[in-house]
């Protein structure tokens, strides 16, 4: 029976329940820019990088600021906000699952669209940074999700073949990235409005409390047989 060698996690909305915070921050930033971004358009940026989001917004709303200026303003605002937080809670059941994975000797990585500074800040404030063998961002990979680049780079960094990785995601962009990388993908369904866009997931859960490493390994093995 083939078993997984690594588990790679998206960060926002998966490891940490930070998506509502990011959405609130972005709404404040959009207000400062004087633009009215619909919920549908805003939702389409889930899992994507700031470069992707601001390139689209600049084109859509004919903004005068350059993409680099928009990103710089965004990252300063986010960094200031998160620095003022004492701690950030991990999602329910996460610490137990990370412990199981670590004890079993599997590699662990993060593949996120957040900037390196924000990613390290949040993971440290959440108290889980030490679990991971690699933290990889889309800015390092060169392309935003739904491109598979960040997942392929994460697998390379931890020395594991893509097909031997399990991914945890929560967005359509992230799911597309993981599947395009040839990885088994479990999706945490946190937004009922995008459930149809998550139909390509190998497995759906509501919370980490529903899953164990043993169950993950079984699902991975069954998927290999079916494929």
Over which residues does each language-model region extend?
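Asp-based, Mg2+/Mn2+-dependent phosphohydrolase catalytic module
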Residues: 1-6, 99-102, 115-227
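Active-site neighborhood of HAD-like aspartate-dependent phosphohydrolases
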Residues: 1-43, 193
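Hydrophobic alpha-helical core bundles mediating ligand binding, dimerization, or RNAP-core interactions
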Residues: 22, 26-30, 50-57, 71-82, ...
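Residue-level detector of anion-binding/catalytic polar loops
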Residues: 36, 107, 184
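Metal-dependent phosphoesterase signature
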Residues: 58-96, 104
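Alpha-helical substrate-recognition element adjacent to the catalytic core
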Residues: 29-61, 67
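Helix N-cap/coil-helix junction residues
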Residues: 35-37, 63, 128, 159-160
């Amino acid at each position: 029976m083939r078993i997984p060698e690594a588990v790679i996690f998206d960060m926002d909305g998966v490891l940490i329940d930070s998506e509502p915070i990011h959405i609130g921050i972005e709404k404040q930033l959009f207000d400062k820019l004087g633009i009215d971004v619909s919920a549908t358009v805003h939702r389409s940026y889930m899992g994507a990088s700031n470069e992707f989001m601001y390139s689209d917004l600049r084109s859509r709303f004919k903004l005068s600021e350059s993409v680099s200026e928009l990103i710089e303003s965004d990252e300063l605002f986010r960094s200031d906000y998160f620095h003022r937080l004492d701690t950030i809670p991990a999602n329910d059941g996460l610490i137990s699952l990370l412990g199981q994975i670590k004890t079993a000797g599997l590699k662990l990585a993060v593949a996120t669209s957040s900037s390196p500074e924000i990613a390290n800040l949040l993971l440290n404030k959440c108290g889980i940074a030490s679990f991971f063998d690699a933290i990889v961002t889309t800015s390092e990979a060169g392309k935003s999700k739904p491109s598979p680049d960040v997942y392929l780079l994460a697998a390379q960094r931890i020395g594991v073949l893509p097909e031997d990785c399990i991914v945890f995601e929560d967005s359509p962009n992230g799911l597309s990235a993981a599947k395009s990388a040839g990885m088994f993908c479990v999706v945490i369904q946190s937004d009922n409005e995008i459930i149809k866009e998550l139909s390509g997931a190998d497995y759906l859960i509501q919370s980490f409390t529903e899953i164990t490493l043993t169950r993950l390994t079984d699902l991975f093995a069954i998927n290999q047989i079916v494929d």
